[in-house]
Regions:
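Histidine/acidic residue-rich metal-binding segments in metalloenzymes
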Residues: 185, 238-332, 359-377
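Acidic, glycine-enriched loop/beta-strand segments at the rims
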Residues: 54-58, 73-86, 99-100, 405-410, ...
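Histidine-rich, glycine-flanked metal-binding segment
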Residues: 48-53, 58-64, 73, 79-120
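Active-site gating loops and adjacent loop-to-helix segments of metal-dependent hydrolytic enzymes
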Residues: 131-152, 210-227, 263-270, 328-361
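Divalent metal-dependent hydrolysis catalytic cores, especially in the metallo-beta-lactamase
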Residues: 155-182, 197-206, 251-262, 290, ...
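His/Asp/Glu-enriched, well-ordered alpha-helical/loop segment
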Residues: 142-144, 286, 290, 360-445
Length: 468
């Protein structure tokens, strides 16, 4: 999603680059963006910190077996936690899990004690934008119009690394917002071990109706050819061509904007006809790609649901009957509550803990309430990029504030998201045979969801990226 804000200051820009261990991730990104031949040479030339204590630039292959001994395990097969359990990791997979006395580790296993911590499956955010950064730093239009793609690629590398280090080991990235197919390159770089980051499912450009998204054309000279935040199409032939191009270039998901702010006063209205949406979904499904629909209005949601999309993003205008239909047809819902809070902070002077929730925040909370009432599958998708990467855990806190039990929110960000993303045979639970994506947080998040922000241990594919 896109709106308005103020140009960030140079001081803010410097803070974003220098914070934490971002410089190391920047060094990892520069060979990709600038053509440097040796990352190690670049590290030396820039006099960056040694690798000790940081996510490896090139993750090593998993070493000897690792036995993890936390205080408790939330395995995401239910809402229960298990005290006194242990988890054995061999290679990139979970080899055993259960009561510590029953988990027998090989003699050469490394034992890692995690006292006071709860071990969770790696967290998942099913609605992210790695190529965006908060709109109170740079307006969306300026990000698309003024930031070169190479610059945005470097930023995305930083965002990916920061996200992983905060326990989110998987993202569904729903559109590069003007950076073309660069998400496919980031995904490849992560998969091949060139840079640290979450495993990605990508949607490339997102499909939008002609003159409905932006930048412009309203407010700009009509003779200007403006870069676009999505792939603009009109009519069934162009819709089909866009789906085929995106699938061919590496999209795992097809994202469509079923409505957007193209009304006379800038209000959200439907952007595609029913026939166009039907054709888009049919072609995507024929290509084996599920479809994500941005939809905030009742009519936009209705058309997307009738077309058979797989997920609805935002859904703030959803009605009781629409959510009932979603439940009947197995269409999942990603509420993106944190983005609503961020918009309120940027544009409505909302101050967390001081002001009453805005009308938009109340509308989003009501939509979640209706979705829960109707038994809709609800995942955790935050729209991060609208707000700061690495703070994705805010979405779990909002899910709880707006009605979920803490354990429900944990399931949404693990097993449920994995199922929505069709990756539940690989990730999302702490079960023998699944990938060793594991995160440990201080305290018990089934009692206090806020502790998911206090990440102490991160493992992805059996590789430790963060240790106490």
């Amino acid at each position: 999603m896109r709106p308005v804000a103020t140009r960030r200051s140079k001081a803010i820009g410097r803070a974003r680059i220098s914070r934490g261990i971002a410089p190391l991730a920047l060094a990892a990104a520069l060979p990709l963006a600038l053509g440097a031949q040796s990352t190690d040479t670049l590290l030396s030339a820039l006099k960056l910190p040694s690798r000790a204590g940081f996510a490896p630039l090139v993750p090593p292959p998993p070493g000897r077996p690792v036995l993890l001994r936390p205080d408790r395990v939330f395995d995401a097969t239910s809402e229960e936690t298990h005290t006194g359990w242990a988890v054995l990791v061999e290679g990139d997979s979970i080899a055993a899990v259960g009561p510590a006395a029953a988990v027998r580790a090989p003699s050469d296993a490394e034992t890692i004690a995690l006292p006071g911590l709860t071990l969770l499956p790696g967290l998942i955010d099913a609605h992210s934008h790695l190529f965006l950064h908060p709109y109170n730093e740079t307006v969306w239009n300026d990000q698309v119009l003024k930031e070169p793609e190479g610059y945005r690629m470097v930023e995305a590398v930083l965002h990916a690394r920061n996200t992983l280090m905060q326990g989110f080991t998987t993202l569904r990235d729903l559109g590069t917002e003007g950076a073309g197919f660069a998400d496919v390159a980031i995904k490849r770089a992560i998969d091949e071990g060139l840079i640290p980051g979450p495993r990605l499912a990508v949607a490339t450009r997102a499909i939008v109706a002609t003159s409905s998204y932006g930048p412009g054309p309203r407010g700009f000279r009509p003779d200007l050819e403006l870069p676009q935040g999505g792939q603009a199409v009109s009519g069934i032939p162009q819709v089909l061509a866009a789906v085929r191009e995106q699938a061919g270039r590496g999209a795992d998901w097809i994202k469509v904007y079923a409505d957007y702010g193209r009304g006379p006063g800038g209000e959200a209205v439907p952007t595609f006809s029913q026939d166009e949406l039907d054709a888009l979904v049919s072609e995507a499904h024929s290509a084996g790609r599920p479809v994500s629909a941005h939809a905030t209005t009742p009519e936009g949601m209705r058309r997307a649901i009738l077309a058979g999309v797989n997920t609805i993003e935002h859904g703030f205008g959803g009605t009781d009957s629409l959510f009932h239909t979603m439940a009947v047809h197995g269409i999942a819902y990603l509420p993106t509550l944190t983005a609503v809070e961020a918009y309120a902070e940027y544009f409505d002077h909302y101050v967390p803990g001081k002001n009453e929730p805005t009308a938009s925040m109340r509308e989003a909370a009501h939509a979640l309430e209706l979705a829960m009432k109707n038994g809709v599958t609800i995942g955790c998708g935050s729209d991060v990029g609208v707000f700061t990467h690495g703070t994705n855990a805010r979405e779990l806190e909002w899910l709880v504030r707006d009605g979920m039990r803490p354990a429900q929110a944990l399931l949404a960000a693990t097993a449920v998201d994995a199922r929505i993303m069709r990756m539940d045979k690989e990730i999302g639970r702490i079960v023998r045979g699944l990938k060793a994506d594991l995160v440990a947080v201080g305290g018990d998040p089934t009692k206090d969801i806020s502790v998911v922000a206090h990440v102490r241990f991160v493992m992805k594919n059996g590789v430790i990226y963060r240790a106490p």
